[in-house]
Amino acid sequence: MTPEHLPTEQYEAQLAEKVARLQSMMAPFSGLVPEVFRSPVSHYRMRAEFRLWHDGDDLYHIMFDQQTKSRIRVDTFPAASQLINTLMKAMIAGVRDNHALRHKLFQMDYLTTLSNQAVVSLLYHKKLDEEWREAATALRDALRAQGLNVHLIGRATKTKIELDQDYIDERLPVAGKEMIYRQVENSFTQPNAAMNIQMLEWALEVTKDSKGDLLELYCGNGNFSLALARNFNRVLATEIAKPSVAAAQYNIAANHIDNVQIIRMAAEEFTQAMNGVREFNRLQGIDLKGYQCETIFVDPPRSGLDSETEKMVQAYPRILYISCNPETLCKNLETLSQTHTVSRLALFDQFPYTHHMECGVLLTAR
């Protein structure tokens, strides 16, 4: 695979290899055959980052070969959304001959939505001034005149210039209901929107007969907690990143959801609060004991759950675990399987043509 060529004819084979690998990894904990969710074979990534290469008068996007570290010119990127591909051409055309925009530019980051909105961030090794702002505003207006719904952001050391805003609003059809998600530049969002829809619908399906409340750790912009709110009396969710918490609060209001409470704190801190080890001012006015959480949802970073959080989640009758790293999932399952059994297993092909796997498990108490 190269940045400009996807081996789409190999999609089925690479997916079958992942299914076999996941089943083998999960064998000590479950004999289940994974439920498999396929990705679109191209144009599935909603975000992408590229370095810029200045080659005389020419300017183009590049990526680096992971093995050789050699640079690869990238004029089209079929893994990315059609909108990113359109913007890649338009941005190069708009920047190449403009000194204020091109000088010391070293990277462009693209974030797009299925609703055809985009944020493009331009990263510089220089101070950004009024000349840059005027040139960027003219470029933005020219792009919009071409029918592109785009926002531009300039970044340099300790500097961030938003011409309008640093977010876009995604609209996803999830189990018969449109969900609105504000996505903030430079914050985590699910990269494969089509796969995200399938993950949300799978999570809804496996929790459809839930009782009581839901606790979610690492909720981000509320991606899962807001979709799952319809299956629970109440949802209590934690997140540490300020921009993600602000986006989650917006998303709660935009989706007219009244049974979700977001707390800004780390999972480790929340564990301490639940266990009565520490008190936190951020929890004033929130009656943790009043929640009847029968289900806990975790979508941890690649490192998985720490040992204290492992112990904490074992106290819940049902654990819904979405993992972007099956190796750390299996490490966590060595502990969790002492008290819970795997009742559902899913493979989400979030990153086609790579070795990366995303998977989901539902664990029920023995």
From Swiss-Prot:
Reactions that this protein is recorded to catalyse: uridine(54) in tRNA + S-adenosyl-L-methionine = 5-methyluridine(54) in tRNA + S-adenosyl-L-homocysteine + H(+); uridine(341) in tmRNA + S-adenosyl-L-methionine = 5-methyluridine(341) in tmRNA + S-adenosyl-L-homocysteine + H(+)
Positions in coiled-coil regions: none
GO cellular component terms, A-Z: cytosol
InterPro entries the UniProt entry points to: MeTrfase_TrmA_AS, MeTrfase_TrmA_CS, SAM-dependent_MTases_sf, TrmA_MeTrfase, U5_MeTrfase_fam
GO molecular-function term, one example from the UniProt record: tRNA binding
Gene3D superfamilies the record matches: 2.40.50.1070, Vaccinia Virus protein VP39 (3.40.50.150)
Keyword line: Methyltransferase, S-adenosyl-L-methionine, Transferase, tRNA processing
Methyltransferase listed as a keyword: yes
UniProt-annotated catalytic positions: 324, 358
Binding site for S-adenosyl-L-methionine: 190, 218, 223, 239, 299
EC number: 2.1.1.-, 2.1.1.35
Pfam families, alphabetized: tRNA_U5-meth_tr
Alphabetical GO biological process terms: tRNA methylation
Family label: Belongs to the class I-like SAM-binding methyltransferase superfamily. RNA M5U methyltransferase family. TrmA subfamily.
Summary of the function given for this chain in its UniProt record: Dual-specificity methyltransferase that catalyzes the formation of 5-methyluridine at position 54 (m5U54) in all tRNAs, and that of position 341 (m5U341) in tmRNA (transfer-mRNA).
Record's protein name: tRNA/tmRNA (uracil-C(5))-methyltransferase
Annotated source species: Salmonella heidelberg (strain SL476)
